[in-house]
C-alpha cells in the first residue's frame, strides 16, 4: 500500500542535479582542485548521436567550476563525467554509501548506482547529471548534505531525542554519535563553498 510507504527512507528516485555534489567530489579527488576547470557551454553537448541540453537550452558560455555548479550547467557536468569515467564516479558514489547499508533503524531502500555495466557513452552522459538508472532516497541525500555541512562527518541519524515517563521525567536521552567520515574536512569545505553559491 503506497500510502504506508515512508518516501523519505523507502522512496528511490533519480537524484537529478543534486548528483552534481557527488560529481564535484569525484572531480576534486581526481584533480586535487577545482581551479583547473574551464568549460565553454554552448547550451548542449552531443556524443555518439546523443544530445543533452542545459535546462531550456540555456547557454552559460565560459564557466569555471563554481559557476557550472551554481548554474547547474548540465553540459559541463556531462563533460566532467566523460573525462572522469564510469569507475571514478562509481567509486566516489560508493564512498558516499551508494550500494551500501545506511546507519538508520527504519525500513529503507538502499540507494543504487551501477556504471560498471558497459552501456556506452550516452548512458554515462545521463548518469553524470543524475539521470539514467541511479536511484537515491531523500534520506540518503539529506545525510550526504549533512556530512558536507558537518565538515565531512556523517552523524548517525536518530528519530527520538528523549523519552519521558508519565510524570514528565526524562528516562532516556539519545546522544549524537559519528557514524563515519564520508570526506575530509577540506573536501567538505570546498563542496560547502559550491553549495553556498547556488
What are these regions (language model features)?
Residues 1-17, 22-198:
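Beta-lactam-recognizing serine transpeptidase/beta-lactamase-like catalytic domain environment
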Amino acid at each position: 500500500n503506497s500510502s504506508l510507504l515512508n518516501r523519505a527512507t523507502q522512496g528511490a528516485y533519480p537524484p537529478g542535479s543534486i548528483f552534481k555534489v557527488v560529481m564535484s567530489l569525484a572531480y576534486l579527488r581526481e584533480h586535487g582542485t577545482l581551479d583547473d576547470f574551464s568549460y565553454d557551454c554552448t547550451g548542449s553537448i552531443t556524443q555518439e548521436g546523443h544530445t543533452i541540453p542545459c535546462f531550456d537550452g540555456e547557454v552559460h558560455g565560459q564557466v569555471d567550476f563554481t559557476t557550472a555548479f551554481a548554474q547547474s550547467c548540465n553540459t559541463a557536468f556531462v563533460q566532467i563525467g566523460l573525462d572522469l569515467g564510469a569507475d571514478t564516479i562509481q567509486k566516489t558514489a560508493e564512498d558516499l554509501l551508494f550500494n551500501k547499508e545506511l546507519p538508520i533503524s527504519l525500513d529503507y531502500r538502499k540507494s543504487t548506482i551501477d556504471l560498471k555495466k558497459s552501456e556506452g557513452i550516452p548512458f554515462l552522459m545521463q548518469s553524470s547529471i543524475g539521470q539514467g538508472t541511479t536511484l537515491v532516497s531523500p534520506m540518503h541525500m539529506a545525510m550526504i548534505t549533512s556530512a558536507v555541512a558537518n565538515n565531512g562527518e556523517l552523524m548517525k541519524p536518530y528519530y527520538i531525542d528523549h523519552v519521558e515517563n508519565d510524570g514528565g521525567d526524562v528516562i532516556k536521552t539519545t546522544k549524537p554519535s559519528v557514524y563515519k567520515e564520508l570526506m575530509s574536512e577540506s573536501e567538505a569545505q570546498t563542496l560547502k563553498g559550491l553549495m553556498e553559491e547556488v
